[in-house]
Amino acid sequence: DIYNEDGTKVALMDNDAAVKAARFLYDLKFKYGVLPEESMALVGTEVRNQFIEGNIAIASMDAKSGTVLTDAGVNWDFIPSLEDETRATWIASDALIMNSASQNKELAASLIKYITSAEVMAKFHTEIAPFPPITRDEDERFKEMYEDAEHLHTLPVANGAFKVMDTLYKNLQLMMLGDLSPEEAIQNTVDYAESIG
């Protein structure tokens, strides 16, 4: 995790997990040579197109790419997270919240169930938002995500979190360009967080 449990401190150096994850990415390029130079310059659609053409074996993509891959005839699958001692991945999330003062909680719960049903989500994601519907009664490929959701984390809600996340992203980019070591990328992010905190 980027922050400690109560969101008051950047926890990237509290154990070796962040450096190990950064080292894994770094080694893919600099030790094993499986990430070509141009890989860092590719944007989302270019990555997806290269994947469709068979030039990329594994890629991290946004959720809407699933529909594009299927439409292109690609037999694809996904894993929610790589795994070492533990596993985790960041996910985007929205929430439908029932007010505790609601006078008709049963009606509110029924509305939430209706809105999140596969039928409504399919319509929502074809007519309003171009992301594939991912609900518990949707594509079998997403079943594991709903059965074992403890490894899914939303972005941290903490003071200055956006600035820290942006700095981490930039430091990891510098690392992948060879300007920082994995240890420096993580430590520089922690130092920045402490300077604004």
Label each residue range with its predicted role.
Residues 7-39:
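Glycine-centered hinge/linker elements that transmit conformational signals in sensory
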Residues 19-22, 26, 48, 52, ...:
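Extracytoplasmic/secreted envelope proteins and their assembly/folding machinery
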Residues 53, 57-58:
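Short, Asp-centered acidic motifs that coordinate Mg2+ and/or phosphate
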